[in-house]
């Protein structure tokens, strides 16, 4: 397994719409394993393949406190949603920034597991929010897109400055 590089906003590759997974190969299993390793190393609760420059409809999630409830969603689609909620969301691709994002409180999702087996899942609270957040990545959308243009621009400028400083330090 390997830790993958996480793309950072405003990298345009984050805007790529992910393609459906067509075949379930050993390479796909390695991608899923690497995504989990990366997510845990970055102390995240979810990661979409788009964030690691793999433009396929793959999501890994683990919202458990002890990191013992990994969930893989391949080619996910929301079948139903209800309610309204929101929490301050963060994102591995937008480090050190959080914002309140409106989300459905409950979702019913259909997806394939890592072996290509179809399943449906009903989720609420943090898991529902995380699924919606990661599914946004698959269509090239980030949580900052829910913010005003001014707030989005401020975040962009701060992250660009951080990236410049990181490059100077090398």
UniProtKB/Swiss-Prot annotation:
SUPFAM superfamilies: Peptide deformylase. Keywords: Hydrolase, Iron, Metal-binding, Protein biosynthesis. GO terms for molecular function: metal ion binding; peptide deformylase activity. Fe cation binds at residues 91, 133, 137. Binds 1 Fe(2+) ion. The active site is at residue 134. Its EC number is 3.5.1.88. It comes from the Bacteria. Removes the formyl group from the N-terminal Met of newly synthesized proteins. Requires at least a dipeptide for an efficient rate of reaction. N-terminal L-methionine is a prerequisite for activity but the enzyme has broad specificity at other positions. This is Peptide deformylase.
């Amino acid at each position: 397994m390997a830790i993958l590089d996480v793309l950072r906003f405003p990298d345009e590759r984050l805007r790529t719409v992910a393609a459906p997974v067509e075949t379930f190969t050993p390479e796909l299993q390695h991608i899923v394993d690497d995504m989990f390793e990366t997510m845990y190393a970055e102390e995240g609760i979810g990661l979409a393949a788009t964030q690691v420059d793999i433009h396929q409809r793959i999501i890994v999630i683990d919202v458990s406190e002890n990191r013992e409830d990994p969930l893989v969603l391949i080619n996910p689609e929301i079948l139903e949603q209800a309610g309204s909620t929101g929490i301050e969301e963060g994102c591995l691709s937008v480090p050190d920034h959080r914002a309140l994002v409106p989300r459905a409180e409950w979702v019913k999702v259909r997806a394939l597991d890592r072996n290509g087996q179809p399943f449906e899942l009903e989720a609420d609270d943090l898991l529902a929010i995380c699924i919606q957040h990661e599914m946004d990545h698959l269509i090239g959308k980030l949580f900052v897109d829910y913010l005003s243009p001014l707030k989005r621009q401020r975040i962009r400028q701060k992250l660009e400055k951080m990236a410049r400083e990181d490059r100077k330090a090398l």
